[in-house]
């Protein structure tokens, strides 16, 4: 669920969640469009990455689930100190996250692979891009490989809302600070990279 401090801001009527996998109308919490990962792709992702020293997160209808060991010590898995409180307050604990993902492989908005360093991250991305066809891969922070259905993405979500409201891209402004914002910023008539963004990638 989105923080009340966000959804209570006047003028914010829609929400794009899970890297564009779902679009909601805030007033009545109606889901206007959603994608889920295919069962086959979830199975492939878990099989291809089982020998990597990683853990996982899964998202179902906007709720995040993660492994007990990750929630207890996010820094051990590459998270920064200032991210600890966020991870621990937003993730629902699962003793066996792999079994959980397998049990819910037909209803995942998206899933994250939590890696320990950039080299491992690039290897995981390389393997997934080569072997799994129907997924969209992006990243918002260094330790995450974020995966959703191939037609998801923030650009896709913003495009849907733009057309739903009868607007055109020139009338859209978007703000972003990470790799998973790039396609959205390119789509918007006014794309703005935040001062703390990875400017080399977003410029």
Regions found by a protein language model. Give the residues of each.
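Active-site phosphate-binding/coordination module
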Residues: 1-79
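Conserved acidic, metal-coordinating active-site core of Asp-based
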Residues: 48, 52, 59-175, 179
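Hydrophobic packing residues within well-ordered alpha-helices of enzyme cores
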Residues: 3-6, 124, 128, 199-202
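Short, acidic/turn-prone active-site loops that include or flank metal/cofactor-
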Residues: 20-22, 37, 142, 196-200
């Amino acid at each position: 669920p989105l923080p009340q401090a966000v959804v209570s801001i006047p003028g914010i009527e829609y929400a794009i969640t899970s890297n564009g996998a779902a679009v909601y109308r805030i007033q009545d919490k109606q889901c206007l469009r959603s994608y889920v990962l295919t069962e086959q792709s979830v199975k492939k992702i878990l099989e291809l990455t089982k020998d990597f020293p990683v853990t996982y997160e899964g998202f179902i209808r906007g709720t995040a689930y993660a492994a007990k060991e990750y929630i207890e010590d996010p820094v051990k898995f590459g998270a920064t100190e200032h991210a600890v409180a966020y991870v621990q307050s937003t993730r629902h604990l699962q003793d066996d996250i792999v079994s959980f993902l397998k049990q819910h492989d037909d209803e995942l908005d998206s899933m994250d692979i939590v890696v320990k360093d950039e080299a491992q991250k690039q290897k995981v991305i390389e393997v997934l891009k080569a072997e799994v066809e129907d997924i969209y891969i992006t990243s918002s922070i260094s330790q995450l490989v974020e995966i959703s259905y191939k037609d998801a993405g923030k650009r896709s979500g913003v495009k849907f809302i733009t057309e739903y409201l009868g607007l055109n891209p020139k009338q859209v402004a978007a703000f972003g600070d990470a790799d998973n914002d790039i396609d959205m910023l390119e789509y918007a008539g006014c794309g703005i990279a935040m001062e703390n963004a990875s400017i080399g990638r977003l410029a």
